[in-house]
Amino acid sequence: MEKRTNKMGIDNQKTSFEHQSLEVSMLDKDNFSDEELDSYLSKGEIKATDKVTIPPKILFVGDCTIATFGNFSASTGKAKSKKTFNISAMVAAAVTNTTVLNYRACLPEGKRKILYFDTEQSKYHCHTVLERIYKLSGLSFKKDDPRLMFWGLREYTPKLRIALIDYALRKYDEVGLVIIDGLRDLMYDINNGKEATDVMTVLMAWTSVYDLHIHTVLHLNKNDNNPRGHIQYSVNSYVID
């Protein structure tokens, strides 16, 4: 794909919704034309004559399915509770389509690429996570494996992080699994109900439009076992224990 320059506004962290998907651009709109409404309605229509297949099951813990295409899941835990280590094992299993620790993966051909977005760690710590995944996968450190792409989005605003994830999903083909480590960092205010709903909406849109699975990480408060902010009420049913 030809590289687009100055479209994402990296320097000043402004985004141009002209170049975003409908799924993301709709979040900042209050009014829709009849043409737009007709397009959305047509995309959402369910017909008896539709040929609908069962979504592939791609991740397991033992005999329990924890991930299918068209859905998303979440992990929670306090700081230093090995959340990222568990995610590393999950990704390592997905990269190799084998069993790593407690996780077993079975991604279909043509959907083997994994995109990993970390929203809060430094480049050094992101690289440490990537090294751990390679080690668990048995991959060589001498070359980058094309099945796994990793980005650190710590320095960007929540709106730009969403735009970058959306751009990556449009840019790269054959994606089957997306990791977002730091879901709260896609929001400006974790206690804002509208923002929480918007983030959930875009997650559901991405999984549906691109037919993949998204696994997110939510962080617990230090003094209790509750995920931080209003977003907790939206994702509780998606949490993997």
Positions of PLM-derived features:
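Conserved inter-motif catalytic segment of the P-loop NTP-binding fold
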Residues: 108-194, 198
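Short loop/turn motifs at secondary-structure junctions
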Residues: 71, 173-174, 179, 211, ...
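Short, small/acidic-rich helices and loops at N termini and domain boundaries
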Residues: 1-37
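Short, flexible loop segments at the rims of nucleotide/cofactor-binding pockets, characterized by
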Residues: 51-53, 155-157, 191-193, 223-227
